[in-house]
């Protein structure tokens, strides 16, 4: 099995790593001040900020930005801003939620699919929005390197993967900017042994025991699904022009990711609530009938009530989203996705707040195997400043 690979990494060879590493491009998409403050902090120092396209700026000077990003990548390579290393990296990220431990490795895009009902070893958790892929493809197709914010999850309840790790020398150890906490990266000395431990999690008999299905599943995508989908599209477009021999070893076939145990205590799963803004709130609530034996809390103008909600949470969210879309199409309004009970409570004076139950970590893999992709915005993993920061890179040309 070659789904996993020890990558040839490009590690930053710069003096100020706190200026180099920046948050995932899909965070703080409504917070221009965050990105302005980050740019001011970075200043003229070498930074991954110059190699990414923050989504808050999508649609603004797109062609020029992408051309500048690609040129910056080539310039950094020419100036020796990276040092090469073949190996896996043990990443220990400390945030307000605790210390989360991950492993940076490369995965075969032939073993990944974002299509619902797929049976690949690596699958998306949420429905992929087709229109969000092309901008990422446009950035990637001419880029010489990739910097990942993709986080894959694996189901290792007894911790066999991390217990197999032999920690080597420290590669980096620094504070992250903008309240991102602290990160330490160490070389893993026994990469092949660690990959073997990962492969064992997708053993057919083990999957049957854990999920009641023989469908072999190793990773689900926790963060960065649309970026991984863009990498897949770029690879599918490229491979048709390659010989069979070239396809097996081309660097674009493998995507750089960080893999984290879903049972990591510092990995928080939280529901994403809905806030519906409409001038007909009473009508919305009157016809909000989802059925089921569970409950969801509805708050309107500070008043709270409850509606029936299916015990199958993804099924309930799918039904709710369908109702919201139909209501807005007929009566007008808009929907926003809110993280945190307190924020929803505060905002419910501006609309109808629907507080959803959280899915359990223990159920995620089983839900993906049995039902395919979950509805969009089903859950989130921690706060925005806990997301992955760009540090390592890998050649894709």
Give, region by region, the residue ranges found by the protein language model.
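N-terminal extension/subdomain marker
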Residues: 1-180, 206-208, 216, 359-397
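Active-site beta-strand/loop microenvironment that shapes enzyme catalytic pockets
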Residues: 200-242
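C-terminal catalytic or substrate-handling cores of phosphate/nucleotide-
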Residues: 275-378
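A residue-level signal for conserved active-site and pocket-lining positions in enzyme catalytic cores
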Residues: 152, 224, 348
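Short beta-strand segments
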Residues: 153, 221-222, 258, 355-357
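Catalytic or ion-translocation cores adjacent to nucleophile or general acid/base/metal-coordination motifs
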Residues: 225-286
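Compact, glycine/acidic-enriched structural inserts
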Residues: 167-188, 264, 269-289
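Portal/gating segments that form or line small-molecule/metal binding sites
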Residues: 152, 176-201, 205
């Amino acid at each position: 099995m070659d789904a996993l690979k020890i990558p040839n990494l490009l590690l930053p060879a710069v003096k100020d790593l706190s200026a180099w590493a920046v948050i995932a491009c899909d965070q703080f998409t409504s917070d221009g001040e965050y990105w302005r403050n980050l740019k001011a902090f970075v200043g003229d120092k070498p930074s991954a900020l110059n190699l990414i396209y923050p989504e808050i700026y999508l649609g603004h000077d797109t062609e020029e930005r992408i051309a500048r990003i690609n040129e910056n990548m080539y310039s950094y390579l020419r100036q020796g801003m990276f040092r090469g290393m073949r190996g896996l990296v043990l990443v220990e990220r400390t945030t307000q939620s605790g210390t989360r431990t991950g492993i940076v490795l490369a995965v075969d895009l032939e073993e990944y699919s974002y299509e619902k009902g797929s049976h690949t070893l690596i699958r998306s958790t949420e429905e992929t929005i087709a229109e969000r892929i092309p901008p990422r493809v446009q950035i990637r197709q001419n880029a010489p390197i990739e910097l990942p914010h993709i986080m894959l999850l694996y189901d290792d309840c007894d911790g066999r993967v991390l217990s197999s790790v032999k920690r080597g020398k420290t590669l980096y150890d620094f504070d992250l900017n903008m309240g991102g906490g602290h990160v330490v990266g160490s070389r893993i000395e026994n990469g092949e042994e660690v990959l073997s431990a990962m492969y064992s999690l997708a053993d057919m008999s083990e999957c049957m025991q854990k999920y009641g299905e023989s469908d072999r599943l190793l990773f689900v995508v926790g963060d960065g699904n649309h970026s991984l989908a863009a990498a897949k599209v770029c690879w599918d477009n490229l491979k048709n022009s390659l010989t069979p021999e070239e396809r097996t070893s081309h660097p674009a076939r493998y995507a750089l990711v960080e893999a984290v145990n879903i049972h990591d205590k510092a990995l928080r799963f939280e529901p994403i609530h809905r806030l519906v803004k409409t001038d007909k709130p009473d009508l919305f609530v009157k016809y909000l009938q989802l059925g089921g034996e569970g409950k969801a809390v509805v708050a309107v103008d500070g008043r709270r009530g409850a509606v029936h909600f299916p015990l199958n949470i993804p099924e309930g969210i799918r039904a709710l989203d369908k109702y919201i879309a139909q209501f807005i199409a007929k009566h007008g309004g808009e929907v926003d996705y809110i993280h945190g009970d307190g924020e929803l409570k505060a905002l419910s004076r501006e609309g109808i707040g629907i507080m959803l139950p959280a899915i359990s970590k223990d159920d995620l893999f089983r839900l993906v195997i049995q039902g395919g992709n979950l509805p969009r915005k089903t859950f989130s993993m921690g706060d925005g400043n806990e997301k992955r920061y760009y540090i390592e890179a890998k050649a894709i040309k």
